[in-house]
Amino acid sequence: MAKDIRECLLEQVGKFHQWQEITYPGKTTEEIGGAWEVDYPAWNDIFDAFCHVLTQMNAEMADSVLLDEMVYLIARDNEAEGFIQETTSHPQWFECLCRRAAASNENEAKWQFAAYLPECSCSQEVRDIILDFAKDPNEYVSRRALLAMPALRPDCVEQFAPLFWERNCYSPELQEYQRIAVLVSLDAIHSDLLPQYLERAKQDGRSYLLEHAKRIEGGLAMNEKLSRPQFNQMDTTEKQTLMESLAARYDMTFLGLHTFDRWGQNCTTGIFKKDGREFVFVPGDTVTLGWE
């Protein structure tokens, strides 16, 4: 049974390889470039066979040939990301394929595993592969790894920040993207290093980097306003405006202000809705969003 499932997928991959060779004779995937894979007419057949392997075959039974071809397919599906999304629902397979991808030359697979590692219930050993992806020489692989690191290894973000900021091995455009990733990841972990990197971004002066720095600074200013003392000093209109800004920042729907008695004092809070669930913002020394 498992052999038939394996052979079915390998047969579909073989057809894809044949199509690739006929359509782009003598060229590697890097030499072809662009989103050439989307022109293949039988992606649905490959996807069905791929999903059948995930659901009907134990990952421990997979040999190197099957694993390599599955990593190859994930890499070729880098535009739609359907294969990697499906794989995240199968942690054993995700772990096997993530390890295989990390040891491969398939950059289009590596960045997807880096990006989707936070979405999968993997072992800590596999989650730590994010550190290897962050050291990858491919710019996009390393950048996606740094952006995912706050969810996986927040304790390591600060040690990678200088590396990403200072290295000059990429084009000026890609270096700017590396520095943007530093700001975003430091902001995600509320790092004490963030202010100095925001200042360095201003000194850098490139437009996209400045844009992200201003956006992050705006968020920091909002967090200051959301502390309880400042919040209490606002009138109702100011509170309403601030809550609407908070909703926009976190892609939520603001349902209105609510005043309640807490320890003998009147407290005002904001009620929000996201993904069909309502929750409350409670101003305090730091921003706290809690499900209700």
PLM regions: where:
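Amphipathic alpha-helical scaffolding segments comprising HEAT/armadillo-like alpha-solenoid repeats
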Residues: M57-D68, H90-A103, C122-K135, P154-N168, ...
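Extended beta-strand/loop cores of jelly-roll/beta-sandwich
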Residues: K225-E292
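Residue-level detector of extended alpha-helical repeat arrays and alpha-solenoid scaffolds
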Residues: D77-E81, K110, S142, Q175, ...
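Alpha-solenoid helical repeat scaffolds
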Residues: L97, Q112-F113, I129, R144-A145, ...
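Short inter-helical turns and helix N-cap capping residues of alpha-solenoid HEAT/ARM repeat scaffolds
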Residues: N105-E106, P137-Y140, S171-Q175, G205-R206
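Extended repeat-based scaffolds of very large eukaryotic assembly and lipid-transport proteins
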Residues: M1-C120, Q124
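Structural detector for tandem alpha-solenoid helical repeats, activating at a conserved register
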Residues: W93, E108, E125, Y140, ...
